[in-house]
């Protein structure tokens, strides 16, 4: 399947200033992310940014980059603008890779892209939770699926709630209980991506602070690729940055 990867990147970060430009083994983080995406088999990889410094860093490292407006409320709106500028067809598949994932598995990008079909215009990924602390951590977003592997709901709460298992103990995951952790990787059919910014914000999205709930609330199916392996963690804190720097200097 042919697909395009678009990587939204903003310079502002409350916990880690100038994160996209952080040096990782001699290259900016955003360049490292793009290089991983290039290994996915994507027909095109392009960075979407509203900052001249990120644009310059990409250009200096031969990474395709497109300037965008500065007023986008989300990364999804930003990649929708770039897809429109590129003149991609309605049926084109676009994958949104986060700009702070320099260790993302290229095969995960490709597997998520392949789930897009005429019936399912959006896809994402998940993996099995094996740590009870993650099951109860509201910063770990959970997802439950239907029999077709499509998302029924995303939540910061522990879903599904194993009534009998948790009645016995909340110190360990119940037997035969496999909660899924959502991975923030998204693929779209371009026709839906262009319509997305016009979708009204949903009450559930506001309650949970999860943008993907807007899609489900409007009745649009989301396919979910379940990977057997937990993905490498992204870079959100100075500690994360040190960990990833060690990887690139080995």
Swiss-Prot record:
Designated name of the protein: 3-deoxy-manno-octulosonate cytidylyltransferase
EC category name: transferase
Gene name of the record: kdsB
Gene3D superfamilies: Spore Coat Polysaccharide Biosynthesis Protein SpsA, Chain A
Entry annotated with the keyword Transmembrane: no
Localisation: Cytoplasm
InterPro entries documented for this protein: Cytidylyl_trans, KdsB, Nucleotide-diphossugar_trans
Alphabetized GO MF terms: 3-deoxy-manno-octulosonate cytidylyltransferase activity
Protein's organism: Herminiimonas arsenicoxydans
Lineage, broadest ranks: Bacteria, Pseudomonadati, Pseudomonadota, Betaproteobacteria, Burkholderiales
Catalytic reaction annotation: 3-deoxy-alpha-D-manno-oct-2-ulosonate + CTP = CMP-3-deoxy-beta-D-manno-octulosonate + diphosphate
């Amino acid at each position: 399947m042919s697909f395009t990867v678009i990587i939204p990147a903003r310079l502002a970060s409350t916990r880690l200033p100038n994160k996209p430009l952080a040096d990782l083994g001699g290259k900016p983080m955003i360049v490292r992310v793009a290089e991983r995406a290039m290994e996915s088999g994507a027909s095109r990889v392009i960075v979407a940014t509203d900052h001249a410094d990120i644009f310059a860093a990409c250009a200096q490292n031969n990474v395709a980059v497109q300037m965008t407006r500065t007023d986008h409320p989300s990364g999804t709106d930003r990649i929708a603008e770039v897809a429109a500028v590129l003149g991609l067809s309605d049926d084109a598949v676009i994958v949104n890779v986060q700009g702070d994932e320099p260790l993302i598995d290229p095969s995960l990008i490709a597997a998520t892209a392949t789930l897009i079909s005429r019936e399912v215009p959006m896809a994402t990924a998940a993996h099995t939770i094996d740590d009870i602390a993650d099951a109860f951590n509201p910063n770990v977003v959970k997802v439950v699926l239907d029999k077709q592997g499509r998302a029924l709901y995303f939540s910061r709460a522990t879903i599904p709630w194993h009534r009998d298992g948790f009645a016995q103990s909340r110190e360990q995951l119940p037997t035969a209980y496999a909660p899924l952790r959502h991975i923030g990787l998204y693929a779209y059919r371009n026709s839906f991506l262009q319509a997305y910014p016009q979708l009204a914000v949903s009450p559930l999205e506001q309650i949970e602070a999860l943008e993907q709930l807007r899609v489900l609330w409007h009745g649009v199916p989301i396919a979910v690729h379940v990977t057997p392996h937990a993905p490498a963690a992204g870079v959100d804190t100075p500690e994360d940055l040190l960990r990833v720097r060690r990887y690139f200097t080995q």
